[in-house]
Amino acid sequence: MSLTDRTKPTDVSLNTDLYELTMAQGFWESGLVDTQATFNAFFRENPFGGGYAVACGMGQIPELVENFVFDDEDINYLASIPAPGGGSMFKPAFLEYLRNHHLDLTIHAVPEGDVVFPREPMVRVQGPLIDCQLIETALLNLVNFQTLVATKTSRVVRAAEGHPVSDFGLRRAQGPDGGLAVARASYIAGASSTSNLLAGKIYSIPVFGTHAHSWVMAFPTELDAFRAFAKSSPKNCVLLLDTYDVHQGIKNAITVAKEMEAAGERLAAIRIDSGDLAKL
């Protein structure tokens, strides 16, 4: 399962801004479709006030180009779009041109995971002007978000100084595809694992997880919950401390850790999910 398998492959052609198609129609009418062009993708400032960015998303560009076609359903939808001044947004002859059109592009990109800097090309797209224009939004959609996530993850990984970092961002990600993109970019940038099982399946990323506050709340006491989890998952026992009180949670985790050691097992880790770590 890859970039386009979640929907039908041709859906990527409509994953674009309307103005890419209106400009393409204008190029077609003006006889500029075969004019050779070069588009460069770059950014002006490093994100997060940092000194670098980490390039990501480029590995999915070849698949994007291969599947960037307009099928009958796409053409029918475009034909149904009205122009604000009346009539149809797109001319039938132009839509017929799109129906049989395939991109003919040469694309150069920095490798994923490379450090990049402002005002230098991350991706260079060369080919007929209309093709460069048609793919612009979809390509930037792949690269911009994943580069942002990879950069942030890289900063976290560096701050961790060799300790493993796991992506737990699915529940706050920008939808299902956003969750996949975050897991992919985080792994490329140095995260050791993800909580996202679908990303683990698709991209062969190691998966990792603990338990939630709801687990603790399901038992009479926090200590009961910790003991039950240690019994259920002795080889993957990470205890969440902050359901009620972090300091008491630490004491209960120590109790369970000693009990596990006596039984020949070992507490893997503890986790704090909220609050100000500096104050703790």
For each predicted feature, which ranges?
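Ordered alpha/beta subdomains of enzyme catalytic regions
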Residues: 1-235, 266
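Glycine-rich phosphate/ribose-binding loops and adjacent secondary-structure elements
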Residues: 214-280
